Amino acid sequence: MRFSSAWHAPVMQVHVVDHPLVAERLTRLRERGTERPEFRQVLKEISGFLVYEATREHAIAPVDIDTPMGPTVGVRLADVPVVVPVMRAGLGMLDAALGLLPDARTGFVGLKRDEETLLPHAYVNTVPEDLEGREVLVLDPMLATGGSCVHTCRLLRASSAGRIVVVCVLSAPEGIDTLRESGSADVLYTASIDERLNDIGFILPGLGDAGDRQFGLA
């Protein structure tokens, strides 16, 4: 089934991308000894696999083309999604998304988590004011407490976003529950649903802080 960009799910759907290439790269991301350059490259690769799956049901439209052998009918995307990485960590997923969706518009949401309350605080918001029912891909490597993702999705809803698809490498059950209960996202694609959060809101077994591991603060 393919969906128009304005379609909203009555209940958030959750898809775990179960594939050997995804699992192998996830193992490398989890490994403590993986150095920053490799971590960034592997994050880009696994993000490409996830975005590929996240766009599987995107609406398409027929288009007439000419091949070297004659005319035929192909397809194009009915409406190119808007891509919104959640800063900082989501920046590492952006190149992969734009590699597959080169015509996509990009918005940025920068959120910092208060380590005491675990609530997000926005320091950047360049989401287009009127998304006009456009589908949006939210990129964030980690769905932990879910607060940052819910905050981002609500900003998108306020800008009249259509179908919101969240793309995460790792997800905690608590974060999935928070996102689902908020009603702010339509679909979640993730490479793994991990065991739980620890007492300071980090995913277990997880991979540490995805932002720090990309940008040299860990």
Name each model feature, range by range:
Residues 1-218:
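PRPP-associated nucleotide enzymes
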